[in-house]
Design a protein with these regions (language model features):
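Periplasmic N-terminal accessory/gating domains of Gram-negative outer-membrane beta-barrel systems
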Residues: 96-114, 123-243, 253-265, 269-275, ...
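Transmembrane beta-barrel wall of Gram-negative outer-membrane proteins
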Residues: 266-341, 358-381, 526, 676
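Periplasm-facing N-terminal accessory domains of Gram-negative outer-membrane beta-barrel systems
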Residues: 18, 22-146, 199
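Solvent-exposed loop/turn elements at secondary-structure boundaries
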Residues: 529-647, 758
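C-terminal beta-signal and adjacent terminal beta-strands/loops
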Residues: 613, 724-745, 768-826
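Transmembrane beta-barrel strands of outer-membrane/channel proteins
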Residues: 129, 250-258, 289-295, 333-337, ...
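Gram-negative outer-membrane beta-barrel transporters
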Residues: 617-742
Length: 826
């Protein structure tokens, strides 16, 4: 059966199921036999007066139970209620649950409820955590790490939020700290901080750092995300940070430096971070400051004194403020600073000081957001953000750079400077709900971005020697200095309808339009998703969706023809005679404007909550990408003369399929255990990455993507232990990532991804005890990362002609960890 017919048939079947569900579930829960005249409007706000959407409402009177969920404006109206006294329970994950025992319908037409965000250290002992729930209004395939999970679960580099994301199934991290969601490349992911784009505008990488202690939650959406999100086919990473309230609060983490026993007792690193928050004016204005500092000293045992040390420092701070101009008009501003510098970066036994780099990079984000609620029920949210990214890479000196199988010598061959800016303007409008064959909530919005980018390179010739010291290759650059610049303008708009024919069925349909000055064509992205509550108790849900997604134009890929050329001169075994003319490496843009990379995604899921506070989730997702951006090498045979004349092409095709099962159990006292298994396949017909700095003299070819992990088991949690301690753990096992084999001429040997790293396994354990000292609440943790000492490698010598072929490096091994946190004053 042709593919389009199969998909059409699936769509018809699904719509038929929805139609039947409307007829079966068309009668709302409530009091169907009695005439009703009363109504109750529930308004849910947080402690700062911001509307809380998707809050679960349970209204009970005797044996009658009514359920509802707040809309975008934090409102929900219970209609046709008999007068009387009710109990109202309000819950949402990430907030403390709240119960109003006496809500008198008939005496009041509305009730305003304040939900407080969960905090690690609270003044009251009678608070109740909102348990994981089956959310009838969530059609997106999304997963959340809340503040408790981010702080309690042990993982590598707990000061970097990117290392927490692999705690979610479907999310893997590569050796360069970059994140991949459901088989996607990092640049196919949209990263946002409090609703603003923080993705690097050139590379598409996630490089911005935020103080982990300031993060309230991280939401990862991998499929079925609505049309308000675009410019990403891989998924959405949404970081949400906190805000002060009417109490002054402070916290501090890792404020004591650590030491190391290398060449005597030496300073190792110091990574303090803290948060300070409180009112500027109680009930109306608040602030948050979240500074962090990192200083590292790297000592290499094998190097001589005076040439054995590298240092790195980093400073970051998030400053936020919120002012409620009126209860219906809220203004929020923020300023994020990242600044780091590394001296002698890359220092190792194989890379002496003279061959290292001095690295400097910075990122800045300035935002302003206005939220207005109008009396007619309209919600208007406007935003303005400016961001800047700067990267510099400076070698030490100007000595000729020489690469040997055992060590490098001289000064690194390349100097680079890069600057990029993004100006972002957003506007979103939520219209009042409309009753027409059910309830409709309409949302429209726009996103306008202006991106500028410039980069310069200064490259010097370098040589590559064989094991016996003879010259194998000499590399020269026709233009030692290269400068490039590229700008882009992006315009987006969307319209979305959330239709609830009944209290058990939700259909979310929308369309998105995108245009930019590189592709220069209007991109239309229709999407459809729905959720159906299979049981009246709200504990079982079926969800499915299909949609078209486009990637943002990647300036790094499209600008490669401007990045310069290089010539490789190959020598015979004696290192004296040239084997032929030099091989030129160049990139060329094809004719006409490129097409936008496009994906068609569809997925289906089943969720169920057992009475024992156990939550089960099953899911299947399929992604099919086409028109992907890549470069092709015209050489067609591995025996043909070396060639590196790369031509831009829209011929990349990516495939991803995955089945996932996960379970979560919550214990009394907010302890929990999570486990999941994912079976997946991530492949492409173009997996070879070509670049001027590291060319591959082979044709483009297909195979598994470098982050493909067909089998993965993941588990983590924290449980009560002896002596009032909590035992926390994380366990991650997955198939090793694939890698390609090359020869000394940088030609592929066999198909790409023909070999794999050993299976990855890491078990992290930690014990934490909370106690009071001098009136302050503290938490002391000690544990081990990779307690089994698995020695998971990050890199491999993939040169089949190298005497160290298949030698693994980048091995961490077992690491003792400790953490001291000041939670506040008791």
């Amino acid at each position: 059966m042709p593919r389009f017919l199969r998909r059409s048939l699936l769509t018809i079947v699904w719509l038929s199921m929805l139609k039947g569900a409307v007829h079966r579930a068309g009668t709302p829960q409530g009091f169907p036999s009695e005439p009703q005249s009363r109504s109750l409007l529930v308004i849910v706000l947080d402690e700062n007066g911001v509307a809380v959407s998707s809050a679960s409402l349970i209204l009970t009177q005797g044996q009658t139970v009514l359920r509802g969920e707040t809309n975008y404006a934090g409102r929900y109206e219970f209609a046709r209620l008999p007068a009387g006294t009710y109990q109202l329970r309000v819950e949402k994950e990430g907030f403390f649950a709240l119960v109003h025992e006496e809500v008198r319908v008939g005496e009041a037409e509305s009730i305003e409820v304040t939900l407080n965000h969960q905090r690690e250290f609270v003044e009251r002992v009678d608070v109740t955590y909102s348990p994981p729930a089956v959310d009838p209004a969530r059609t997106t395939s999304s997963q959340t790490l809340d503040r408790e999970e981010i702080l309690n679960v042990p993982y590598n580099v707990t000061r970097d939020i990117r290392y927490a994301l692999p705690l979610l199934p479907g999310v893997v991290q590569d050796a360069f700290s970059q994140i991949h969601i459901d088989g996607s490349s990092t640049h196919q992911i949209y990263d946002e901080l409090d609703g603003f784009n923080i993705t690097n505008p050139v590379s598409g990488l996630f490089t911005v750092r935020v103080n982990v202690d300031a993060v309230r939650s991280v939401v990862v959406q991998s499929s079925r995300y609505p049309v308000e999100y675009g410019k990403a086919t891989g998924g959405i990473v949404s970081l949400k940070t906190g805000m002060g309230d009417d109490y002054f609060r402070f916290s501090a983490t890792d404020f004591f430096p650590s030491v190391q026993s290398r060449k005597g007792l030496q300073f190792s690193n110091w990574t303090p971070r803290g948060t300070f928050s409180g009112p500027l004016r109680k009930g109306r204005a608040w602030f948050l400051l979240a500074p962090e500092v990192e200083y590292d000293l790297n000592i290499i045992q094998e190097l001589p004194p005076g040439a054995d040390r590298g240092t790195a420092w980093r400073f970051g701070n998030l400053a936020k403020t919120q002012v409620n101009l009126t209860p219906a008009n809220i203004l929020t501003g923020s300023f994020l600073v990242n600044d780091s510098n590394s001296q002698h970066a890359g220092l190792s036994r194989l890379t002496p000081v003279e061959s290292t780099l001095n690295l400097s990079d910075a990122a800045y984000l300035l935002t302003l957001r206005d939220l207005a609620y109008f009396p007619n029920g309209v919600l208007l949210e406007t935003g303005l953000a400016w961001s800047r990214f700067r990267d510099r890479s400076l070698p030490l000196g100007d000595q000729p750079y020489v690469i040997t199988p055992d060590i490098v010598r001289g000064s690194y061959f390349e100097t680079s400077h890069s600057h990029s800016d993004r100006l972002q303007v957003t506007a979103d409008v939520v219209l009042p709900p409309v009753r027409l064959q059910g309830r409709h909530e309409f949302k429209v919005g726009t996103d306008i971005d202006r991106i500028s980018y410039d980069q310069s390179f200064d490259r010097q010739p370098f040589s590559i020697l064989r094991e016996d010291g003879t010259l194998a290759r000499r590399v020269k650059f026709p233009a030692s200095s290269v400068a490039l610049a590229r700008n882009n303008a992006e315009f987006s708009g969307y319209a979305q309808d959330r239709w609830s024919p009944s209290d058990r069925l939700l259909v979310e349909a929308g369309v998105r339009l995108d245009w930019d000055q590189i592709v220069r064509g209007v991109l239309v992205s229709p999407r459809l998703a729905s959720s159906l509550m299979l049981t009246r108790d709200g504990n079982t849900k079926l969800v499915a969706g299909v949609g078209t997604y486009y990637d943002a134009s990647n300036l790094q890929i499209i600008s490669q023809p401007q990045a310069g050329e290089r010539f490789d001169f190959f020598y015979d075994k004696n290192g004296q005679k040239l084997l032929g003319p030099p091989v030129a490496t160049s990139f060329r843009q094809g004719e006409g404007n490129p097409k936008a990379p496009q994906f068609l995604n569809w997925s289906v899921g089943l969720e169920h909550r057992f009475p024992t506070t156990t939550y089960l989730r099953l899911g299947f997702v399929q992604k099919r990408g086409f028109n992907g951006w890549t470069y092709l090498n015209p050489v067609t045979e591995s025996t043909a003369p070396l060639s590196a004349s790369y031509v831009f092409s829209n011929s990349r095709r990516d495939h991803y399929d995955a089945f996932q099962i996960q379970a979560r159990h919550t214990f009394k006292g907010d302890h929990m255990v999570f486990a999941s298994y994912v079976r997946s396949s991530a492949t492409s017909n173009a997996v070879v990455n070509f670049s001027v700095d590291n060319p591959v003299f082979s044709p483009q070819a297909g195979g598994p993507l470098p982050w493909d992990a067909p089998n993965r088991f993941l588990s983590w949690g924290w449980v009560p232990f002896w002596w009032k301690c909590d035992l926390a753990y994380s366990l991650d096992w997955h198939t090793g990532f694939p890698f390609s084999v090359v020869n000394e001429n940088q030609q592929l040997v066999g198909p790409p991804g023909s070999m794999r790293f050993p299976a990855y396994f890491a078990l992290n354990l930690a014990l934490e005890r909370r106690f009071t000292f001098l009136g302050y609440q503290l938490a002391l943790r000690a544990g081990f990362d990779d307690i089994t000492n698995r020695h998971n490698p990050a890199f491999v010598d993939n040169n089949i002609d190298s005497p160290k072929f298949l030698t693994y490096t980048g091995i961490q091994g077992r690491t003792l960890t400790a953490r001291l946190r000041l939670l506040g004053r008791k």
